[in-house]
UniProtKB/Swiss-Prot annotation:
Lineage: Eukaryota, Fungi, Dikarya, Ascomycota, Taphrinomycotina
GO cellular component, one term: endoplasmic reticulum membrane
One Pfam assignment: adh_short
Membrane-crossing segments per the record: 15-35
Residue positions binding NADP(+): V61, D115, N142, K177, Y216, K220, V249, S251
Protein name: Very-long-chain 3-oxoacyl-CoA reductase
Function summary: Component of the microsomal membrane bound fatty acid elongation system, which produces the 26-carbon very long-chain fatty acids (VLCFA) from palmitate. Catalyzes the reduction of the 3-ketoacyl-CoA intermediate that is formed in each cycle of fatty acid elongation. VLCFAs serve as precursors for ceramide and sphingolipids.
Active-site residues from the entry: Y216, K220
Protein topology in the membrane: Single-pass membrane protein
Organism, as annotated: Schizosaccharomyces pombe (strain 972 / ATCC 24843)
Length: 341
């Protein structure tokens, strides 16, 4: 009997010890994760743009370049010493921005007008031919479209659905395909030359289910996984790939006009983005980052702290989008009434 008691005590002691070790390891891992998050978000410095050939005659390609975040990428890259290929829909806007950058930043520019809702394989073959021979080291995949207003998938028009997928997915892949072959050729010619960068704009909608923006959310989730896959494929060839996710940014697409702690201006967001290349902020997924500090905090909190509560967050996102939809519908009704008066 005494032997059985001793055996039971020994077994219980082993179980307690095992759980204690597990608890200690879990605590250490959580603390390490938190410390890494704090360091990368608030203290670490990203890869310098000189690594990609800034001020050495190399070129950056920016899509969706004439408004909002895209315009800021083009402007800040030009001010950092890159010549810039500007791609957007409206030639008049392209010409105005090109003139501005040539005057202010003293760089070379090229403009290419592309309506990403109407592209074909021939569009991107022509783009590739137009860019062959240009020493491109940076591609910013910024062009994108969201829903006109939050709408259930059942009520989303076929045109809006197709445009979102055509621009965000088809357009981004084909633009990257056209530019990547040029980058690879440059790297093969000069392995000791600057590295190359492919940076694609993602969204929080791709991190977390976004009811009433379902098509847009799906397109951004696709870009996250595609970027991570591509990043692993080309890293040994001297090409860095990142998907930068943002929460809301003041822009025409977000329909937000005033900046807040969590909603930066395009200038602030892009400044944070270009200074945090190479830093995996706000999450654990490789090649994916939330470069703006408050966005990184939000993302890390969702990933590390909420766990099963993510379902509650999704329901709150749905409620927020429904509220936005109601306000948009009221505004439309008000404008319609004014026009009829």
């Amino acid at each position: 009997m005494d032997g059985e008691v001793l055996a039971n005590k020994s077994c219980c002691g082993a179980v307690v010890t095992a759980f204690s070790v597990i608890g200690i390891v879990f605590t250490i891992l959580k603390f390490t994760s938190f410390a890494s998050f704090v360091y990368k978000t608030f203290f670490a410095k990203g890869v310098k743009l000189s690594v990609y050939g800034a001020k050495k005659g190399y070129w950056a390609v920016v899509t969706g370049a004439t408004d909002g975040i895209g315009k800021e990428y083009a402007t800040q890259l030009a001010m950092s010493g890159f010549n810039v290929v500007l791609i957007s829909r409206t030639q008049e806007k392209l010409d105005a921005l090109a003139k501005e950058l040539e005057t202010v930043a003293k760089v070379k520019t090229r403009t290419i007008a592309i309506d990403y809702t109407k592209t074909t394989a021939e569009t991107f073959e022509k783009l590739h031919q137009d860019l062959v021979g240009t020493p491109i080291t940076v591609l910013i995949n910024n062009v994108g479209q969201s829903h006109y207003m939050p709408t259930s998938f059942a009520e989303t028009t076929v045109k809006e659905m197709d445009d979102i997928m055509h621009i965000n997915c088809f357009g981004t892949l084909h633009t990257t395909k056209a530019v990547l072959s040029i980058m690879l050729r440059e790297r093969q010619k000069n392995e000791k030359g600057p590295r190359c960068l492919i940076l694609t704009m993602g969204s929080f909608a791709g991190l977390l289910p976004s009811p009433y923006l379902s098509t847009y959310a799906g397109s951004k989730a696709f870009l996250s996984n595609w970027s991570a896959s591509l990043g692993e494929e080309v890293k040994k060839q001297g090409i860095d790939v990142w998907c930068f996710n943002s929460y809301l940014v003041v822009s025409a697409m977000s329909k937000v006009r005033r900046p807040t702690l969590t909603i930066p201006t395009p200038k602030k967001f892009v400044r944070a983005a270009l200074s945090s290349i190479g830093l995996q902020r706000g999450g654990t997924n490789p090649y994916i980052s939330q470069p703006y500090p408050s966005h990184a905090v939000m993302s890390w909190s969702l990933e590390q702290l909420l766990g099963s509560a993510k379902g509650f967050v999704v329901s709150q996102v749905a409620a927020m989008h429904l509220s936005i939809r109601k306000r948009a519908l009221r505004k439309e009704a008000r404008l319609q009434a004014q026009n009829q008066a």
